[in-house]
């Protein structure tokens, strides 16, 4: 099959090189109706030229494709469904296109396979979702097709491995073709065609948060997390999800964390994208090592200068790998903390709402308890003891700390706590076998809001669990429905801890506590090495 595709595309190529103007013709030559196509479509980097080329194919020649991709990020990723070029979709994340994808799903324009977590989708590339054709993005290539993927390697090795070794075709877009690549990230014998775009591939600055946007309420939740969870369990190995709440934690480490005497005791080893808001903690000596899923726009020079912290190649640039980092997050991290849009009374959380289907990204994987884990650590053992004190210690399984953090009322004053997740309504509307729940309640160990911390590990039954959640739900309808006496008993047992129970005065949650209060401050911390995207520069 591959030989026939190569022969069909041969007239368009000089060796492996295909002109950008012929990219659409190349796809028409190698694709067959109904085939599986994997396009990058990553969390951050995008094979944007190839996405546009695919959206421009003749739908009479190429139609009914089954798209398997990590991220639905660009408009072209959905244009192919509107034009009938693609029919079925299996994916993980769709943040920038969350509203449009919802409309297409509700309108029958997309046949949904499933919404996955990254590692789950990657696994299926090798079992039942193996791509016939992969469209990938790299920085540069040489004449033999050796690729340099640079800091944003991300998903590329996984996609190429699954496709190239199962009779598939790999097509790479590159910024330029060079005589010698700085580093061979993908060997040329796995790449069949190279399209020179003449410009860098698009990268979404997904993990950049302007400290100016951090509120005092978010600072309070960060203080609670640091003192009530990080310090309590001695969390050294961790992952932070996206959001202002976790950005606040990062910016409080050199100030509030220092005041608590926690340097060297917490937050030393990370599975994390290079968050700009972590720069002050790195420069203050908090961080020993970071392995990255991908890079972040503007962080390249800073990473080169801090090869003592980041994983870098001989050329000095970051080597990221989403599959490996997701594995590290699953098995080698003791804590995941992230935000969500909705939490129900069982602790299930989801980012699906009535109008948005953002997908999950890595959260279901990072926020799950790895039952195959066998190595002990202090936080893991302590959490396991809180969950199950009766089992003998030598036989007691530890627990990963999975923390959901947020304000009781979120964007547009929408309550974070709900009786029923919108994900259930979506499942009913689309006749799905499984509701798209991001983190299941039995994996969630703590819920943090401005009202305090609910420790779900210590709940003895479903009623206690429900009221622990109600107890930190504030003035939402869920919070107002609490049994005050039961909530107070839970507080007496330490299941619920208010700020004052931890010696935290809410009035101390002041923006002056942040180690950086603007993007410009982050640039200063980096000694000018961090080059923020233009949208974040106001000076």
Features from the language model and the residues they span:
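Conserved alpha/beta enzyme-core scaffold
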Residues: 1-539
